[in-house]
A protein has these predicted regions:
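Short histidine/acidic/glycine/proline-rich micro-motifs that form metal-
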Residues: 27, 87-91
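Active-site environment of divalent metal-dependent phosphoester hydrolases
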Residues: 36, 62-67, 90-91, 144-147
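Active-site metal-binding motif and surrounding structural segment of the metallo-beta-lactamase
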Residues: 38-84
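Active-site neighborhood of phospho(di)ester-bond hydrolases with catalytic His/Asp-centered motifs
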Residues: 29-32, 54-61, 83-85, 140-142, ...
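Conserved beta-strand hairpin/beta-sheet module of binuclear metal-dependent hydrolase folds
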Residues: 1-47, 53, 150-159
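Metallo-beta-lactamase
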Residues: 90-138
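Core dinuclear metal-dependent hydrolase active-site scaffold
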Residues: 20-21, 129-152
Length: 162
């Protein structure tokens, strides 16, 4: 079952969230930005978990509000596998272009809004196929060309920004 975690972006509720998929191999669907790591850590602890307990990070797309903390999470937990579309994967491995364009857009507010944007080691990246864990994956381009949505066996959909 998926457990919604509000990441309290810049102290505001209902702006950015992640879903925790509990079980033998705990997973997050999207992770939010590094600026929200404190809220994520607190919510995981309330559920008896630490970042180091996570095994999978399933990303709908690479925008900062959905995937900005991916590299920081992998640095803290090198066994974390990051599932992302093949189109989005290179931007996680080398986020320099993504960061450059975001810094132009957000200016001096970038660090406060998004925090660190660390690279994800290529060895930690798993391109999304037809299935990720128990989720059916399917492309949902529009908001982003690399956007992927995930459907549970029970019919719930993790749609990101689709």
């Amino acid at each position: 079952m998926a457990d919604l975690i509000d990441l309290l972006h810049v102290g505001r509720r209902r702006v950015i969230a992640t879903y925790l998929l509990a079980g033998d191999e705990p997973a997050l669907v999207d992770c939010g930005p590094s600026s929200c790591l404190g809220a994520l850590e607190e919510a995981l602890r309330e559920r008896g978990l630490e970042i180091e307990d996570l095994r999978h990070l399933v990303l709908t797309h690479i925008h900062l509000d959905h995937a900005g903390a991916a590299g920081t999470l992998v640095r803290r937990n090198p066994s974390l596998q990051v599932h992302v579309s093949a189109i989005g994967a290179p931007h996680l491995v080398d986020p320099s272009r993504l960061e450059r364009s975001a810094r132009r857009l957000y200016g001096e507010d970038f660090d406060r809004l998004w925090g660190e944007l660390a690279p994800v080691p290529e060895a930690s990246v798993r391109p999304v196929g037809e299935r990720v864990l128990e989720l059916e994956a399917f492309p949902t381009p529009g908001h982003a060309s690399h956007h992927v949505s995930f459907l549970t066996a029970g019919g719930a959909c993790f749609a990101g920004d689709a």
